């Protein structure tokens, strides 16, 4: 009986190791060499949140570990492609840990083929910065700021393309 248990254990171990090997060979090589991501502290990021040009700025705060954030990224990418010619700029601000930039953030951007500008916010343990973006912000993500030189709206919610586009229309009508 004991011998049978040992044999079953080693067979099981063999299956697990083979499965891992198959998964490892199925992974695609992703070229991360052309994925520029700058790391900013809040003082450096702030000018990107207060631009006075004639454009409409859409700033999304997200992280690779945030499932709702990842789910809504295609909506921001589509918004960028559809409305870039109408003066809409999209900025994706990653709130991942800076030490994960090479292991998680850049490979994620490359795999998802994100075309929007991506920056990573590194403000250490100081999380007081988010209240300066909007006093109602609890700090939860996803969160989005849409603004132009005349108006500024903040959203602590997830978006699909249709609802994001509807909010953008408010700014396009101005």
Where are these regions (language model features)?
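N-terminal targeting signals for export/organelle localization
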Residues: 1-39, 152-154, 161, 174
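A short beta-strand-turn-helix
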Residues: 36-57, 80
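Loop/turn elements at helix/coil->beta-strand transitions in domains of secreted/extracellular proteins
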Residues: 52-57, 86-89, 114-117
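Short pre-active-site segment immediately N-terminal to redox-active cysteine/selenocysteine motifs
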Residues: 55-57, 61-65, 97
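Conserved redox-active cysteine motifs that mediate thiol-disulfide chemistry
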Residues: 61-78
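Structural microenvironment flanking redox-active thiols in thiol-disulfide oxidoreductases
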Residues: 74-112, 125-131
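Short, internal strand/loop/helix patches
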Residues: 108-141, 149
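Thiol-/selenol-based redox modules, centered on thioredoxin-like
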Residues: 141-174
């Amino acid at each position: 009986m004991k011998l049978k248990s040992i044999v079953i254990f080693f067979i099981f171990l063999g299956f697990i190791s083979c499965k891992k090997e198959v998964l490892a060979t199925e992974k695609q090589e992703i070229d991360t060499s052309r994925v520029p991501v700058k790391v900013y502290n809040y003082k450096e990021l702030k000018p990107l949140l207060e631009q006075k040009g004639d454009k409409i700025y859409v700033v999304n705060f997200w992280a690779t570990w945030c499932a709702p954030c990842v789910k809504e990224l295609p909506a921001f990418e589509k918004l960028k492609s559809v409305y870039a010619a109408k003066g809409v700029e999209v900025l994706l601000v990653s709130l991942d840990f800076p030490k994960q930039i090479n292991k998680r953030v850049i490979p994620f951007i490359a795999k998802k083929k994100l075309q929007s500008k991506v920056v990573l916010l590194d403000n250490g343990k100081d999380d007081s910065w988010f209240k300066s973006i909007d006093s109602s912000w609890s700090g939860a993500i996803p969160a989005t700021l849409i603004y132009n030189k005349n108006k500024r709206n903040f959203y602590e919610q997830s978006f699909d393309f249709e609802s994001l586009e509807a909010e953008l229309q408010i700014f396009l009508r101005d």
